[in-house]
């Protein structure tokens, strides 16, 4: 299983399963001298961790991260940073009924066919439990980028099911369990998710993630364009089925004179491209949106097959999110930060001596 790392110079490698002993990450490429402690990572982990509201899974994990290497006397040493989170609230008995069957819409069938064997407890490696380490690693990137450039990565929920947020107040995002910036949409989100849980079903979601104060010039055409790597990172998140950069799929119905992001000496006149032109950051705000599918872990019985290749029915047990998008915001923020940190280091490595012909225009 070779797909456990992301990034080239800022490289994050994770391991661990939903019901294993714990989760681990190795973070390579962190420059030396960054002041770093566990609390710096814990803030984002607390935003992601399960069991914090009635609208998410009731599995209760403290997700207390431990830094086991790469930091000395409160500063990064430039060597690999090792991170560890213990699993404490596994209930593997809830999954005994799927040891011989495949949950429809899950990775059970494909993991079994690929590896010939699978850890069925909570989905094993395919569970979103592994994203805790992404958030921890992403918090390191966010801290460095903020201190170096004033760069801010933040996200919010746009849509849950058929309910859509109509406005954005960043002060509201941290005040509700949905990471929603529309105070009027929160009661509608609450009612919908409560109803879904009662019905034994689930719904999808759409999130927006922004990166502000990104310097111009990051991205490595042609195959490692910044937007290509962002899309790759976002699609690696569990349940993500669509990624948009800038205006995204809406451009199919737009016209060239509307979307070409004209320039002036005073700055850009629009940002339909989402802060990336030709695969390189323009200095404008990077705008990313992701769509997450409804989780297939629902309490309604579904048709499937078993290991004997026989038709059967399966009922999913365990503790699950009625909408996985509720806790996905800090995960998506982390993935965007990881990509940006990697591209900063790559840009510096190749282009540190490049002299721009003029100062960048305003975003």
UniProtKB/Swiss-Prot annotation:
It catalyses: 5-O-(1-carboxyvinyl)-3-phosphoshikimate = chorismate + phosphate. InterPro entries: Chorismate_synth (IPR000453), Chorismate_synth_AroC_sf (IPR035904), Chorismate_synthase_CS (IPR020541). One of its GO terms (biological process) is aromatic amino acid family biosynthetic process. Transmembrane segments: none annotated. NADP(+) binds at residue 48. Its EC number is 4.2.3.5. The keyword Transport does not apply. Pathway: Metabolic intermediate biosynthesis; chorismate biosynthesis; chorismate from D-erythrose 4-phosphate and phosphoenolpyruvate: step 7/7. Its cofactor is FMNH2. One of its GO terms (molecular function) is chorismate synthase activity. FMN binds at residues 125-127, 238-239, 278, 293-297, 319. Reduced FMN (FMNH(2)). It comes from the Bacteria. Keywords: Amino-acid biosynthesis, Aromatic amino acid biosynthesis, FAD, Flavoprotein, FMN, Lyase, NADP. GO terms for cellular component: cytosol. This reaction introduces a second double bond into the aromatic ring system. Belongs to the chorismate synthase family. Homotetramer. This is Chorismate synthase. It comes from Acinetobacter baylyi (strain ATCC 33305 / BD413 / ADP1). The lineage of its organism: Bacteria, Pseudomonadati, Pseudomonadota, Gammaproteobacteria, Moraxellales.
